[in-house]
């Protein structure tokens, strides 16, 4: 994920698909182990109305093998249709991208889509967009319980996905090592992000080791950071918001800020400054390049423009310092020196720089005591088809001064190999892909595959650097079979704002260039892109070899007991349906749930209480995994879980009561499984 709340529309769009209600569904009697949920009506937490639920079942149109065939249950829809709204990354987020912070990060930027999408259409009923598949019942969904009423969905925040921390460029040859507490690259901007600090609430677990100290973070002067001028950043003016009480600088923009460059955030690929009018209850403020921020209603009269720029400049300066410190802290040795739960780490008792790590521990491999301990965690199960991953410290250009640690990547891969056989990267900067390949080689992992990531930015310099590095990686690879494909861009269309048409053309051109290079080199690898589920249309489907959609029920304000069903239903109706009549594969490229930090009620509105909507927490994360993971494994749903490890530096993107940006991992930054969290074992079945 990448950016504040991403939205998903239920519009027909250019795909020309018929309204869901017009489809005839044939049920199949499969997976009889899917049991019905409670008898009787369930209360809709959003409106208090009773909702009848039936059993999970399957549709014939491309949904084979998705459950048993119970009697169709009545529609769960009511007379209202909630519409959340935003998502991720700004063009400032340079190359490589980090896994992402979480949605609230981009609250300062409009979702770039608005209520205008509803204008000029004939709603099926009051306040319900005609393009929505409102008549589809939950009986066609293999997950239990069934989905709630249709509503606009969100994607991951800037915090999530690539937006989290834009990754950087190829790192000069450096020896592998650890990160030290005296090195800025080893420290988080805030030493104790999980403890109560001001408005920041403690997470489900406390900080350890390097993070538990009370030392002040190392100051970093952004003027000392190398910059190639390709990462523009400017904070959004502080607009009055009826939809959000707090706003945050987008993760991608924040990453760009690390370079110390202030610039106008135009639409992706030179997009216009007009806000996207596709979705959302309130028109945007025209910052299409911003992350997936919630809708921000402009102040009447426009406010004082000059004062706004002054305040913006000051805020930008502050954010630059924060992001620089936070991003640099991405390579914290905390990961390398903590012992994993149920596994004893044999080395790394103190934080070290990358070079010091190698000097002390050597180039870690499968025979290293520390690695053996990490690879023997009985609480981890290989039940995820894929996991989104970005190594720490790969923000460009910070990685040029504070190189990431090879040993830390090796440690991460030792853990990831117990969860999945498939890892997705977001960019090529800072040697991140090469480090992952080296780790796989040292660990002698034979069944791990990689989806290569290429960060596409509004600045051609960034995109060019990323693509050229992809070519080098492919050309230098000893064995191409380790790669599953290349993902060119993450949520590029979302970040394009209202100028999606030209952005799509540019994106498709980049994809075609990569395809041509592969063909020239006789490389048979699929080329795709990942974006919000509702940003896909027939044109993009035709250009991509694989349809990859980021779908986050949390940002849609979906109660966790309905989240799994909602996710599958949304994906089926908006993405799988687009591939009907083709042989193209569909993958959910990001899906997950935060382990703490508040709750989200969608629509850009404040929650009435702390239990409304989607609640972040370990119990809720367990519930979502319980409803999603094993059933997805049984029915063959292909997806990437977001994400394996927390990224504490992202605390800088937490705002008000939305403190989940740094809490999307199954494990903390030290690779400890979070207290109380249980990864399903699915009866011993594993992902292949």
Curated annotation (Swiss-Prot):
Residues 341-355 have a biased composition (Low complexity). Its main location: membrane. Residues 175-188 have a biased composition (Polar residues). SUPFAM superfamilies: (Trans)glycosidases. The keyword Membrane applies. The keyword Transmembrane applies. One of its GO terms (cellular component) is fungal-type cell wall. It is a single-pass type II membrane protein. It is an enzyme of class 3 (hydrolase). Residues 1-307 are cytoplasmic. Belongs to the glycosyl hydrolase 17 family. This is Probable glucan endo-1,3-beta-glucosidase btgC.
């Amino acid at each position: 994920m990448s950016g504040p709340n991403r939205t998903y529309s239920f519009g027909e769009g250019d795909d020309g698909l018929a309204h869901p209600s017009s489809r005839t569904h044939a049920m199949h009697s499969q997976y009889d182990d899917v049991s019905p949920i409670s008898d009787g009506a369930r209360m809709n937490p959003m409106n208090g109305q009773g909702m009848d639920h039936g059993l999970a079942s399957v549709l014939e149109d491309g949904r084979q093998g998705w459950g048993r065939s119970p009697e169709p249950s009545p529609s769960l829809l009511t007379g209202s249709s909630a519409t959340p709204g935003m998502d991720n990354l700004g063009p400032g987020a340079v190359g490589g991208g980090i896994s992402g912070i979480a949605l609230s990060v981009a609250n300062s930027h409009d979702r770039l889509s608005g209520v205008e999408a509803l204008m000029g259409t004939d709603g099926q009923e009051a306040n319900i967009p005609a393009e929505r598949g409102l008549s589809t019942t939950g009986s066609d969904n293999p997950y239990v319980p069934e989905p709630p009423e249709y509503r606009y969905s969100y994607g991951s925040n800037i915090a999530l996905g690539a937006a989290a921390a834009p990754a950087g460029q190829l790192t000069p040859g450096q020896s592998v090592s650890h990160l030290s507490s005296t090195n800025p690259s080893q420290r988080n901007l805030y030493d104790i992000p999980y403890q109560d600090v001001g408005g920041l609430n403690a997470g489900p677990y406390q900080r350890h080791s390097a993070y538990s100290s009370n030392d002040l973070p190392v100051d970093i002067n952004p003027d000392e950071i190398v910059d190639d001028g390709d990462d523009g950043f400017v904070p959004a003016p502080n607009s009055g918001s009826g939809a959000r009480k707090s706003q945050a600088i987008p993760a991608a923009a924040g990453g760009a800020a690390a370079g110390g460059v202030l610039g106008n955030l135009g639409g992706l690929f030179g997009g216009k400054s007009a806000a996207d009018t596709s979705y959302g209850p309130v028109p945007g403020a025209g910052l299409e390049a911003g992350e997936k921020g919630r809708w921000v209603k402009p102040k009447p009269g426009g406010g004082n423009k000059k004062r706004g720029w002054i305040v913006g400049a000051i805020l930008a300066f502050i954010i630059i310092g924060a992001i620089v410190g936070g991003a640099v802290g991405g390579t914290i040795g905390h990961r390398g020196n903590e012992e994993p739960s149920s596994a004893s780490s044999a080395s790394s008792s103190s934080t070290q720089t990358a070079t010091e790590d190698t000097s002390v521990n050597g180039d870690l491999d499968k025979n290293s005591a520390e690695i053996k301990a990490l690879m023997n965690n009985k609480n981890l199960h290989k039940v995820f088809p894929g996991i989104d991953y970005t190594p720490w410290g790969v923000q460009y250009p910070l990685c040029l001064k504070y190189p990431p640690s090879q040993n830390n990547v090796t440690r991460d891969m030792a853990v990831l190999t117990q969860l999945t056989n498939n890892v997705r990267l977001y960019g090529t900067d800072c040697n991140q892909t090469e480090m992952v390949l080296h780790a796989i080689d040292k660990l002698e992992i034979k069944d791990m595959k990689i989806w290569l990531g290429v960060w596409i930015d509004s600045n051609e310099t960034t995109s060019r650097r990323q693509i050229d590095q992809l070519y080098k990686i492919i050309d230098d690879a000893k064995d191409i079979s380790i790669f599953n494909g290349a993902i060119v861009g993450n949520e590029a269309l979302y970040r394009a704002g209202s100028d999606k048409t030209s952005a799509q053309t540019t994106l498709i051109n980049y994809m075609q260039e990569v395809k041509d290079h592969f063909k020239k080199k006789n490389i048979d690898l699929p080329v795709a892109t990942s974006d919000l589920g509702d940003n896909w249309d027939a044109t993009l489907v035709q250009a991509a070899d694989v349809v990859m959609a980021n779908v986050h029920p949390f940002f849609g304000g979906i109660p966790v007991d309905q989240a799994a069903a909602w996710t599958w239903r949304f994906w089926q109706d908006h993405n799988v349906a687009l591939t009907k009549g083709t042989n193209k594969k569909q993958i959910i490229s990001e899906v997950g749930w935060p382990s703490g930090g508040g709750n989200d009620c969608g629509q850009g509105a404040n929650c009435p209480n702390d239990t409304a909507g989607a609640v972040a927490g370990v119990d809720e994360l367990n519930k979502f995994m319980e409803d999603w993971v094993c059933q997805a494994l049984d029915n063959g749903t292909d997806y990437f879980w977001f994400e394996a490890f927390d990224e504490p530096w992202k605390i800088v993107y937490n705002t008000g009561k939305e403190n989940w940006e740094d809490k999307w991992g199954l494990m903390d930054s030290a690779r400890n499984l979070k207290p109380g969290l249980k990864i399903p074992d699915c009866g011993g079945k594993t992902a292949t």
